[in-house]
A protein has these predicted regions:
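Short, acidic, metal-binding catalytic loop of nucleotide-sugar glycosyltransferases
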Residues: 28-37
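A conserved acidic beta->alpha catalytic loop
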Residues: 44-53, 72, 96
Length: 341
């Protein structure tokens, strides 16, 4: 596609905030794809570095690029959703501003979607790279999301060890009509990208190509490096011993939660139940799916309990003035989604 007025087959959404360090490599990889019938939608979340200049430079050179700069920082998830709102293609893919893909990534994913109309999406195996683009290791954790059974897909996704699962499925090529079946597409809470994958996977199989064509960049500016537990659950001493739950904090995703007592594990479990409830299934599939979630609930008991214990401590400290003073988490970057939650 060479005309911005023409309707592309595929839309790529690239949310970015202060991404000057790696965005050239990301854009070069996207524009070098052997599949060229796409538009590249860049949503800049009020970057203060050279991101805008770089993006406008590329947009002048390639008419497939559509650059939008938000009037204010929307936060991470709304900026991802803003990319999708601008999409015109029948297929959609998100791209982080610091990752890259091999030249054949789009072509191979689109070919699989064309071959099997039942698929919700298609992705490839993942290789971790460093800041210089050098290979670190290949991701080992894979899921059975291409099963024709919705219950099997739910079971596989539900019981994977998410500490070792970097959610590479988020960067798949998706059918746009599948992603339009719920709103908001990506919520403003910890691990919301996993709920996107869950919902899309409930609507149809997600094909994994057994080639390492997606390169996930590890570097010091990624959100996952923010591991200060005292800031994740402000006002709590217990987090030193019992853990803090999903990272980064709820406030990082939703500034309106600043200073409030939150229950991230309860929210995550609720989103699982809501996803199954909202997805059309046969009665027996729905019954079996809720059975899977009942087992998940039992598995979640320690984490749900931790939420309650930390909330009780925070409430007690507020009433009595006892405990550490809350410290604010860093401002939301609104850029690449997390790989560790």
């Amino acid at each position: 596609m060479s005309d911005k007025t023409a309707t592309p087959r595929l839309s790529i959404g690239l949310p970015v905030y202060n991404g000057q360090r790696f965005i050239r490599a990301t854009l070069d990889a996207l524009l070098a794809q052997t599949f060229g019938d796409f538009e590249l939608i860049i949503c800049d979340n009020c970057s203060t570095d050279a991101t805008e200049q770089i993006c406008r430079e590329y947009a002048r050179r390639d008419p497939r690029i559509r650059y939008f700069k938000n009037e204010r920082n929307l936060g991470p998830a709304p900026n991802y959703n803003r990319c999708f709102e601008h999409a015109r293609g029948e297929l959609f893919k998100w791209s982080a501003a610091d990752d890259t893909i091999a030249p054949a990534f789009l072509a191979k994913c689109v070919a699989e979607l064309d071959r099997d109309p039942s698929l919700s999406g298609c992705y490839t195996r993942t290789t971790e790279i460093d800041a210089d683009g050098k290979r670190l290791y290949d991701h080992a954790t894979v899921l059975d999301l291409d099963s024709p059974s919705v219950v099997a897909r739910l079971r596989s996704y539900t019981f994977v060890n998410h500490r070792h699962h970097a959610a590479p499925e988020l960067w798949a090529v998706w059918r746009t009509d599948v992603l339009r079946r719920w709103t908001p597409l990506k919520g403003s809470f910890p691990s919301a990208d996993r709920i996107v994958i869950l919902r899309a996977g409930l609507h149809g199989p997600v094909k994994r190509i057994e080639e390492h064509l997606f390169f996930n960049r590890s570097h010091g500016q990624r959100s996952q490096t923010y591991l200060d537990k005292m800031k994740v659950r402000p006002g709590s001493r217990l987090v030193k011993w019992i853990g803090c739950g999903p990272l980064p904090s709820y406030e990082w995703w939703d500034a309106s939660k600043k200073g409030r007592i939150v229950f991230p594990e309860w929210r995550w479990l609720w989103e699982y139940y809501k996803a199954v409830h909202d997805t059309p299934m046969r009665f027996i599939e729905k019954f079996a799916s809720f059975g899977v979630l009942s087992v998940l609930t039992l598995k979640f008991v320690p984490r749900l309990g931790r939420d309650l214990v930390i909330a009780s401590e925070q409430l007690f400290n507020r009433i009595t003035g006892f405990g550490p003073k809350p410290t604010a988490p860093p401002a939301s970057r609104g850029g690449p989604a997390l790989r560790v939650h």
